[in-house]
Amino acid sequence: MIGLLDFDGYICKAFYASIARGEDDFEEMVKVLDDLTKAALDKLKDNFSHGAVIKVISGHTYKKDVYPSYKLGRKRNEDLGAFREYVKLIYEDLKVVPNLEADDVITMMAEDLGNCIVFSDDKDLRYYNPQYCKININEEIGYEADYKKKQLIQLLVGDKEDDIAGIPKVGEKTAEKLLDMYGWNVDSVIEIYRDKQVTIDECLKNLLLISPIRKENVIDYRYGLDDSTTLNNILGHFRYWNEKVTEIYNK
């Protein structure tokens, strides 16, 4: 069994766990990082008799180039940033795609693998790969049974941590009620945006930023993490949502 590690999350966890213990030395932080990584591998072996992990880390995301407000409100920790750069220097087996966040890369890899475990504290990732495990050593592998419904709910609600507004005054419970009325599908999500009088540009922005690159929402999708394939999929992602949103708003 393959484990896809959201290594951005692992780096954060190791950094803050070390700081909480009064340790600010990068080498000590790396020891924590290695312990967390080993724990993930051990869980795979304990549950599936064999296992391997792939450490995925974010590159510079195209989303910030298109929408500068994306994650603008997040506070930057310069020490954490320096530790992240240190990790990139000493780990030779990191999977980095220059224009994609780890979310996009993990989602694409998970679809290609078909059966894998995503290790992350980011709840969004388990909406797109339901077999998941949080990062802490004592966490167990779980399954998000309603992951497809959670995808649609999030498209309406947005993601405040990433500065994605969603529909004003629509929380998870309201989103569920609206989807019960309209139908549990992407077309209904866009119809709800339209009927709530959210502008077409804002609707498109929200859906583009929330939804990761995946087969279902990329025109002419091709699996691959090289530069040309990545660009193809980014453009296909934009075309898919632009055509779908425009069609429904113009009805």
Predicted regions and their residues:
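Domain-level signal for Mg2+-assisted phosphodiester chemistry and nucleotide/NA-binding surfaces
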Residues: 1-86
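Extended two-metal-dependent nuclease catalytic cores across DNA- and RNA-processing enzymes
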Residues: 47-48, 71-249
